[in-house]
Amino acid sequence: ADNDHQEKHLSVFSRKAPYSYGWDWGIRMVTSGIWRPVKIRFYDAASINDYHIKQLSLTEHSAELSNELEINNILPQSIQAEIRINYSFEKGEETVISRSVTLQPGLNSIHIPSEVLSPVRWMPNGWGKPALYDFSAQVVFDGKVVAEQSHRIGLRTVRLVNEKDADGQSFYFEVNGIPMFAKGANYIPQDALLPSVTTERYQTLFRDIKEA
């Protein structure tokens, strides 16, 4: 609220980004209304409310993952469905895992394990390639895909190292077992009116940051 450029600090009464009320780098412009595309989604039998790929372990030989889904069965009765997990690396050969499940009416939590052999690790900027895997989850009912959700993920380990040393205690990060000097900067909105920021402006800015 202290950043509010108005005498009466009104920002505490609304759920908006604080910078809308002014900052040392920006004007006060409290906007309202629809500013992103609106979509209406229709479902025949079920929807995937959430899909998360949890990394359980990572070695040079394999990555053990858990595909965690929250599926909403919108029908009034339980249904037999098939859950398909598809994943590939750099649009290469696709691996498919299939499991038959009973979906009760309402929300259902489903956990499906998967394994990536000889995983290629994601690496930070300047260290190597930021390798990404494509994952998708599908709900199949009566032979038809009724819901689908996709993600791109990187496989890597990150560890905060707090160990006693000559000066007291260390504080640094290891990424994939390699000590990393973390550096960065604050990113602020590129315009007081966010819809005026084009995809090209975002791409140009973050490309410049990456190459700096």
Model-derived features with residue positions:
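Secreted/periplasmic carbohydrate-active enzymes, especially glycoside hydrolases
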Residues: 1-212
